[in-house]
Amino acid sequence: MSEQHNQPGFTDQSLIRNFCIIAHIDHGKSTVADRILQLSGIVPEREMRDRFLDRMDIEQERGITIKSQAVRVPWSYDGQEYTLGMIDTPGHVDFTYEVSRALAACEGAVLLVDATQGIEAQTLSNLYMAIDHDLTIIPVLNKIDLPSAEPDKHAEEIASLIGCEPSDVLRVSGKTGEGVRELLDRIVVDVPAPTGDPDADARALIFDSVYDSYRGIVTYIRMVDGELRSREKLHMMGVGTTYDPIEIGVISPDMMPTRALGAGEVGYVITGAKDVSQSKVGDTITSTAHPATEPLPGYRDPQPMVYAGLFPIDNAQFPELREALDKLKLNDAALIYEPETSVALGFGFRCGFLGLLHMEIVSERLSREFGLDLISTAPNVPYEVTAEDGTVHRVTNPSEFPDGKIKRIVEPMVAADIITPKEFIGAVMDLCQEHRGTMSTMEYISTDRVEMHYRIPLAEIVFDFFDQLKSRTKGYASLDYHDDGEEAADLVKVDILIQGEKIDAFSAIVHRDKAYSYGVMMTKKLRELIPRQQFEIPIQAAIGSRIIARENIRALRKDVLAKCYGGDITRKRKLLEKQKAGKKRMKMLGHVEVPQEAFVAALSTGEGGNDRDTKDKIRAAQKSEG
């Protein structure tokens, strides 16, 4: 076969194999991807670095994959040159939506399992997703070079899970490269070729997009039918816009322009559009010369699990925050946001996230990539509140909570799957009960590991549940959760009052049993953070009109007796009474300004906050105030 036949746009569909690598966090997906890039020779030895496909600084620092990356890899088998389309996916539960989009662009999935850890919660979750997409599963044990690896034991676990023989489970080492060649051969043999029609009208599915400040929107596509040529006009079927493409190409592993993309291939299109609303993940691209009549089925829009407010420390940065969120939305289809105003914090956005890690990554990317200093409010989940007059309110922010009598509050629930060694069953049960969880079933997946299924309110999981689960099980337990309907609960809104005024940024919706502890925690924290004034300041926590906790910030006092050396007690008493009357009048007229740094510190180290940059933010707040 001539060299021409393996060029992008001319590759015979029967020689294409599209696959993704799925696994639990830290099971070695990115390392195996590195070895595949090295073996295929598309990355020269001197340019190779660890976690080659993790392009973001945050990914490199944290050692986690956040964005899926699609790469075209050549591979020879039995004297025939094949083209492999490889997608490296994230492993964390917050980025499941990234994984589901990657699965829709493939025909096969490499299920990677750490030979020292075995099957974990995300392994199962990703496996079930791959089965839902009808993908061919290739089971692989990674890290077999480690002394603590137990490949035989875990090969049997995997075999019983997916219904194959233990001998069918491949054994590789991402570190040494052992077994990777056999894995690539197995992909060529087992993964089916794409089934699109190369002669039909062109249809390509957008599965991701990024913003390039020089060239505009870069759209990642999977060709399903027909072909797209670089000189033809393109039509976005969902948005209804038409473009002359600046460039069409493949990623191998850097962008490589080509003349065309054919059926079954994965590549990119640069349209030159700068308007971020013009590229929607899940849309279908077709050619205006031979337009398709039916668009491809897109993706189900992800539902945010957690809401939080993002406010610029300097209010003048509000337009920049809007622009930054628009650009980030291109690259992160799961992020949703709308403008909001807070009495205390000014203008900002109410953002919806898939989880706490997702929230932390978004705030960090906004501050790094766009140079913004932000305050994020405590995370909330969406509630449905029915007032006594029958009106229903959807509440994503405590300030939207209706006043007056409440008939019913419904909160979102999740089905949590926890896998843990059997010696920690008691500790996990205690933790779930403390967080209002109810157990549904429990089964042993091997002689020493248990899978427990719980139904838990989402509000209990989004704060510190995962950290506590890890600490109580010495890091061995793993957690996966998904939406499981709603349930009525006894919830209340706790307001924080300073000098009798409600401060909306500190309000929270909590379970009645935890209302007192939240009130005590916030009042104590604010007492330390708010500077003393010339008069006494009461800090109160209230449910409706009932005060449940109180702290006082004592008044600063000038020593009015300093000039009295001895003398009559009535003279001293007169001066003290005069001071007292002045303080009383000041207390009635005085207004307490809560400094910006107090907001930053109280919200960053609140229950949900795990913000490591609190001190930097406080400094930035002080600068912007000064």
UniProtKB/Swiss-Prot annotation:
Location of the protein in the cell: Cell membrane
Record-annotated membrane-spanning stretches: none
Keywords: Cell membrane, GTP-binding, Hydrolase, Membrane, Nucleotide-binding, Protein biosynthesis
Domain annotation tr-type G: ranges: 14-195
Gene Ontology cellular-component annotations: plasma membrane
Compositionally biased intervals (Basic and acidic residues): 609-626
Pfam family, one: LepA_C
Membrane topology according to the record: Peripheral membrane protein
GO molecular function: GTP binding; GTPase activity; ribosome binding; translation elongation factor activity
Positions bound to GTP: D26, H27, G28, K29, S30, T31, N142, K143, I144, D145
SUPFAM superfamilies referenced in this protein's UniProt entry, alphabetically: EF-G C-terminal domain-like (SSF54980), P-loop containing nucleoside triphosphate hydrolases (SSF52540), Translation proteins (SSF50447)
Region span, Disordered: 603-626
Catalysed reactions, as listed in the record: GTP + H2O = GDP + phosphate + H(+)
Enzyme Commission numbers on file: 3.6.5.n1
Domain of life: Bacteria
PROSITE patterns (alphabetical): G_TR_1 (PS00301), G_TR_2 (PS51722)
GO biological process assignments: positive regulation of translation
Tagged with keyword Nucleus: no
InterPro entries tied to this protein: EF-4, EFG_III/V, EFG_V-like, EFTu-like_2, G_TR_CS, LepA_C_sf, LepA_CTD, LepA_IV
NCBIfam families membership: lepA (TIGR01393), small_GTP (TIGR00231)
Function: Required for accurate and efficient protein synthesis under certain stress conditions. May act as a fidelity factor of the translation reaction, by catalyzing a one-codon backward translocation of tRNAs on improperly translocated ribosomes. Back-translocation proceeds from a post-translocation (POST) complex to a pre-translocation (PRE) complex, thus giving elongation factor G a second chance to translocate the tRNAs correctly. Binds to ribosomes in a GTP-dependent manner.
Similarity section: Belongs to the TRAFAC class translation factor GTPase superfamily. Classic translation factor GTPase family. LepA subfamily.
Name of the protein this chain belongs to: Elongation factor 4
Organism of origin: Bifidobacterium animalis subsp. lactis (strain AD011)
Underlying gene: lepA
